């Protein structure tokens, strides 16, 4: 061995599966790509289509123009609504302006919208468990008249909620929160209102649950966990928190391989790697390559679940 060649320390890299894109994110990105193909550039997109900088930058390069509000888009160009969902007023405005619009709302989020309307039509008072200001929460609350949905962010909110008719209430949850995330609040609501109407089990986002369950098992056999995802991605932030709570010594959220601080690896022999639902697999591969370039790396996969779900594209793009 050449005297100048450093000794490469061994590292075991455990990949969580599933990780990265879920069916809703995959569909939303395809909608923007297909819209640019069909209608040419520019195609306007209201809000980040998904919360990932790399995805947004790539779509910008294809001809997508990201805007905050519909008023920023001209009447004669197509507009796409993000995967997080939008208030009812947004498609209503697009219709009034006779715009071509494509709704990339995740079908699981759309299910929550349908449930909200059903509860409202049945005269129930509704609480939504979620994070204030998150686009999905804004979209869900915007399905109904102002004041029809009360947002609950923590146990304090759940304890303080006083409906007019305690026997006629319902709760909904933000899809990027798992069963674990909401368990304490749901338990308190059920204790206070035994007859509260709850979401169907199949309406809970499979991707959020699967990715968090995978990270829990990853934490059992990793000293350090790296989560590939953007800081404004709710589900990515939660993956890091779940990893720490499940016993990982350290966990970090990184945009890509350039976000790695190599001092994190000091004294570490087993590293877990996962990605949020809006993070592309090529960024995960970039992290694997960066670690493999520095260490004698063995890669193994920890399979929590196999995901086969796909969602159909809007008819306008497939006709």
Swiss-Prot record:
Keywords: 4Fe-4S, Iron, Iron-sulfur, Isoprene biosynthesis, Metal-binding, Oxidoreductase. It is an enzyme of class 1 (oxidoreductase). The keyword Methyltransferase does not apply. Its cofactor is [4Fe-4S] cluster. Its EC number is 1.17.7.4. GO terms for biological process: dimethylallyl diphosphate biosynthetic process; isopentenyl diphosphate biosynthetic process, methylerythritol 4-phosphate pathway; terpenoid biosynthetic process. Binds 1 [4Fe-4S] cluster per subunit. The active site is at 136 (proton donor). CDD domains: lytB_ispH. Isopentenyl diphosphate binds at residues 51, 84, 134, 233-235, 278. Belongs to the IspH family. This is 4-hydroxy-3-methylbut-2-enyl diphosphate reductase. It comes from Caulobacter vibrioides (strain ATCC 19089 / CIP 103742 / CB 15).
């Amino acid at each position: 061995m050449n005297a100048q060649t450093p000794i490469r320390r061994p590292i075991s890299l455990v990949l969580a599966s599933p990780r990265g894109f879920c069916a809703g994110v995959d569909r939303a990105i395809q909608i923007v790509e297909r819209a640019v193909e069909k209608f040419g550039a520019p195609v306007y997109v209201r809000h980040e289509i998904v919360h990932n900088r790399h995805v947004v930058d790539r779509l910008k390069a294809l001809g997508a123009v990201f805007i905050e509000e519909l008023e920023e888009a001209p009447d004669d160009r197509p507009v796409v609504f993000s995967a997080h969902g939008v208030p009812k007023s947004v498609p209503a405005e697009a219709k009034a302006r006779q715009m071509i619009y494509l709704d990339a709302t995740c079908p699981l989020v759309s299910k929550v919208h349908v449930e909200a309307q059903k509860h409202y039509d049945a005269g129930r008072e509704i609480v939504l468990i979620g994070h204030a200001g998150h686009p999905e929460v804004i979209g869900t609350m915007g399905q109904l008249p102002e004041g029809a949905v009360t947002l609950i962010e923590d146990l304090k909110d759940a304890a303080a909620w006083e409906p007019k008719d305690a026997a006629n209430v319902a709760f909904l949850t933000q899809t990027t929160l798992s069963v674990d995330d909401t368990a304490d609040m749901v338990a308190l609501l059920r204790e206070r209102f035994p007859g509260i109407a709850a979401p169907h089990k199949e309406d809970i986002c499979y991707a959020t649950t699967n990715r968090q369950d995978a990270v829990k098992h990853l934490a059992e056999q990793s000293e350090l966990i790296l989560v590939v995802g953007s800081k404004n991605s709710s589900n990515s932030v939660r993956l890091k928190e779940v990893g720490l709570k499940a016993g990982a010594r350290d966990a970090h959220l990184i945009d890509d391989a350039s976000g790695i601080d190599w001092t994190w690896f000091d004294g570490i022999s087993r590293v877990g790697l996962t990605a949020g639902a809006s993070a592309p697999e090529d960024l995960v591969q970039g992290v694997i390559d960066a670690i493999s370039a520095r260490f004698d790396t063995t890669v193994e996969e920890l399979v929590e679940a196999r995901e086969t779900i796909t969602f159909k594209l809007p008819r306008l793009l497939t006709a």
